[in-house]
Amino acid sequence: KNEKILPLSIKKKVIWAGPYTASREFLSRWSIFGEHESVETIEEVLQKKQIEAECITGCNILSDAECKVWQVEQELSDKPRDEQWLETITQEDTVVCVLGEHESQSGEAASRAFLTLPEEQQVLFEKIAERTRNIVTVVIAGRPLDLRRISEKSKAVIMAWRPGTMGAEAIVDIVYGRINPSGKLSVSIPWCVGQVPISYWDVKTGHILTEDNSENRFTSRYMDIPNTPLYPFGYGLSYTEFDISDIDVQIGQDKKVHVHCNVCNTGNVAGAEVVQCYYETL
């Protein structure tokens, strides 16, 4: 999501908030031999790039109670958690919230019934949202989360997943426009947990919901939420725009389908586009 707030100017006053501004927990559960000591924090990257910004952790990744559930030790921040800084935020300020689940909350033996952010982070986000609408939220996670509230209250959302050793630098470069994002979602982000499992390849059978029968109660639908996900498989934004034209589809003698097209960058920023092709049986 980007409501014309990104990329940010390095001259703009920006507050980076959230426990992941000072955390090195950017590796995934499968990086058995990964060394967290080799991971730079977002705060360190901002200093290295000489970008003036205030960094506030605000809370821990997990509460004490959540640490017991997920069988991890509390990683107490060495930075003060004085909430007076919240009172200094005005409607004109821009806050980049870097939030997400703990690395122990995804991967093997980490099933979850609720896909919201950890409790303390939800509270922190709501307090910030009370002060300003200019919020960019970067989500660190190893699975699709319930991000509806985050999306409603943020002008931009970046799904960073668990970005690895150089993740902090990539996040900072994207936020300030030093690189142009081109990634597309490899999963669907659900509108709420009640939609799970949700997939773009689901075969819809009888009583299919269409534009023509949207008022018909007796269709394959949810009555209280949309059928569509919050962000669908293959979705992703860029700081530029692309035009895909001259699409040609041929079936070769080898019985393979060959697709050709022209891709033109029609914007003012260099970038890359992922051309996606979908087919279905009729």
Each language-model region and where it sits:
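Extended, hydrophobic alpha-helical segments in both membrane/secreted and soluble proteins
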Residues: 121-125, 135, 157, 171
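An anion/phosphate-binding loop that grips the pyrophosphate of nucleotide cofactors and donors
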Residues: 92
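A short helix->loop->beta-strand "cap" motif at the edges of active sites that frequently abuts
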Residues: 51, 130-135, 153-155
